[in-house]
Amino acid sequence: MSIESWTAPVASTPVQANVTIPGSKSQTNRALMLAALAAAQGQGTSTIGGALRSRDTELMISALRTLGLHVDEAGSVLTVNGRITPGEDAQVDCGLAGTVLRFVPPLAALSANPVTFDGDEQARARPITPLLDALRGLGVPVDGVGLPFQVQGSGSVAGGTVAIDASASSQFVSGLLLCAASFTQGVTVQHTGSPVPSAPHIAMTVMMLRQAGVQVDDSVGNRWQVRPGTVAARHWVVEPDLTNAVAFLAAAAVSGGTVRITGWPKTSVQPADNILNILFRLNVVVNQTDSFLEVQGSTVYDGFDVDLRDVGELTPSVAALAALATPGSVSQLHGIAHLRGHETDRLAALSTEINRLGGDCQETSDGLIITATPLRPGVWRAYADHRMAMAGAIVGLRVSGVEVDDIGATHKTLPQFPQLWANMLKRSTG
């Protein structure tokens, strides 16, 4: 993937735009996993409509094909069938995709052949050891404690009860739950340690498992029990990626304009309520119907205090908004210590880049304190992180001369980002 330097366009007038956001990465990759499990159980072919096509989802598709499954595209619909039959020397490239890194190893454990996992250099710093230890606890031999590692499948997994510290990533829990119904005894996952971040993503996993006919008991806090059984083949419909939509909604707040996201679901498996709670802190007017969400901004909003533990992936966009608040106002972002293990150390990256442009951003043990100050032109580094690149675009709406050093990082979850962003601003000025 090439590095593309990009001059962030300025919103010289209030943004007025309707934007259609492609499908959710989180939902797409969970649907692919459940479709693969249904096929592997002999339940038949699944289809996925509205699937996101991005680097992360292509890596997931490639991983499933490496395991012997068939993933085909007919128009805008993905079709998944086949069996788990990896060849000798099978190797899964995780890239920088946490969902591939943490969802596919339990699936590979159902293979009768060993499967090796590796990824981008930055991926080698991402937490994975707790998941590998959990697989070992369920009777799966695993060579290695981090990338690269090898899962020594035997064709089946006994399952049982396992304790895991998922305080670094909720994906540890989701990865086990997705495959648990295919394990002989099912799985009971007990989280130990500090609160699990991004809990809505576990809720998404549980909801989608139930939609596939899997019995999940999550009635006890920090414990999830999945009974052994079939995973139904079905047609999945993927929602627009609401997390990616936040950057575009931020444009309304920053410019005093109006942005409408078409296709915003009235009810969602994504953390829509968390997103709305953040938007309301920005002195905006929100209008939601069955078919869209519209935000009207006022250009002026004060700093805010927000716990982002459940939606840590929004932190770069929220930090950019905090940096553009009323000068002198202070924002506190907390509950996000786990972001140090994301695509990059997002707390350090945000502090560095905001301060590079003349801002005032301080790291705390679990977040950031940002005092809004006038920013100056300069290079905003993306660190190969899609969320960091989008944050630079938000800053550039208000600050002329912001150069995002790698807008291509957005290919991870939204390859169309530069064009969608340019079109949004073009419609506003044209």
Swiss-Prot record:
One annotated GO molecular function: 3-phosphoshikimate 1-carboxyvinyltransferase activity
Cell compartments where the protein resides: Cytoplasm
Enzyme Commission number(s) from the entry: 2.5.1.19
GO CC field: cytoplasm
Record key words, sorted: Amino-acid biosynthesis, Aromatic amino acid biosynthesis, Cytoplasm, Transferase
Residues that bind phosphoenolpyruvate: 25, 98, 126, 171, 346, 387, 412
Active site: 313
GO terms of biological process kind: amino acid biosynthetic process; aromatic amino acid family biosynthetic process; chorismate biosynthetic process
Involved pathway(s): Metabolic intermediate biosynthesis; chorismate biosynthesis; chorismate from D-erythrose 4-phosphate and phosphoenolpyruvate: step 6/7
Catalytic activity: 3-phosphoshikimate + phosphoenolpyruvate = 5-O-(1-carboxyvinyl)-3-phosphoshikimate + phosphate
Record-listed 3-phosphoshikimate binding positions: 25-26, 30, 169-171, 198, 313, 342
Keyword Cytoplasm attributed: yes
TM spans (from-to): none
Enzyme class name: transferase
Pfam families linked: EPSP_synthase (PF00275)
Record carries keyword tRNA-binding: no
InterPro entries on file: Enolpyruvate_Tfrase_dom (IPR001986), Enolpyruvate_Tfrase_sf (IPR036968), EPSP_synthase (IPR006264), EPSP_synthase_CS (IPR023193), RNA3'P_cycl/enolpyr_Trfase_a/b (IPR013792)
Family label: Belongs to the EPSP synthase family.
Its biological purpose: Catalyzes the transfer of the enolpyruvyl moiety of phosphoenolpyruvate (PEP) to the 5-hydroxyl of shikimate-3-phosphate (S3P) to produce enolpyruvyl shikimate-3-phosphate and inorganic phosphate.
Subunit and interaction comment: Monomer.
Name of the protein described by the UniProt record: 3-phosphoshikimate 1-carboxyvinyltransferase
Organism field: Mycobacterium leprae (strain TN)
Lineage: Bacteria, Bacillati, Actinomycetota, Actinomycetes, Mycobacteriales
